[in-house]
Amino acid sequence: MRFTLPFVMAGLAMAAVSAGAQDADQRIVRRDAVRAGARAYQGRNAPEQTERFSRKVKVGRDARVSIDNVAGNIVVTGGSGDEVSIEAVKRTRGDRSELATVRITVDERAGRVEVRTEGEQNRSNRGRRGSQVSVDYTVTVPASASVDLHSVSGSMRVTGVRGSLRAETVSGNVTTTDTPKLEVAKSISGDVSLTGAAAEGDLSAASVSGSVTARGLRAHGLGLGSISGDIILSDVTCDRLGIKSVSGSVEYAGSILKGGRYEINSHSGSVRLTLSNPPGFELTANSFSGTIRSDFPLIIGGDRDRDRGRRRGADNRSIRATFGDGSATVTIRTFSGDIVIAKR
């Protein structure tokens, strides 16, 4: 309607000129038709129409629950029961009939519940799918259930899910709290925020256009990335760390472990590590246009150069040095930004 409305109005105006001899009733009909078209064109500003959906499914405590949504937010909470409670609201600012173009399906299998948002073709939409309808989900699952979330446009918030968790959206924020088996948290356009997360194996979190923040994170391996946004981590413990950032600062506050490997790459942004009593590390740091500073006494070229190495480390743009027993490996590269290794 956005593209066709001007042509419809122009056609009506031309018809009015050529039919100047017609009576007033016909002119009124044309006027009403134009007004109706304008109202349809501005339908997005109409009052919101809603339709509610509710469903409860009995499952085992270790069930798997997946939710696939097109547009709308998803909120999932781990509960104490043995059922999946699904509350959903369809929303549109178009005609109420558009709500029927979107269907919510719930498939039950042995130990598994699959929830999907599906579009249906409707004559009133001339074959288009119900893209103007969003669906917001509020779901409670057994705390030990595993959860898999996917959405095209909408934010996700997950709290208290103790089973494995994967949450991915194209446009929207991803927020998790108290999720000890988090595996994946990703957004293309939106922030990713993790609190009290952990993983038995590797954990991956990333955003293309947004920041990644984490607090109280525990994992064997962390893979984090952002194209345009900061990566800020506090109270973090891991054996392996890989961070890639194109445009944004990186801050890591936490522990490094004996034998651990930690690699941070940033094209345009500063990197700051704040470490709590590290046993030791071997450092390789490079910055094309920035300084490198360490609060730890680094050894560059041998014990006798300890003090001199520390001073030089603050000015050099590329250093290889050791602190303590040198058991961990720390590699930091940034093209444009400072590198700071601070004591906590």
What are these regions (language model features)?
Residues M1-R344:
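Intrinsically disordered, low-complexity terminal regions
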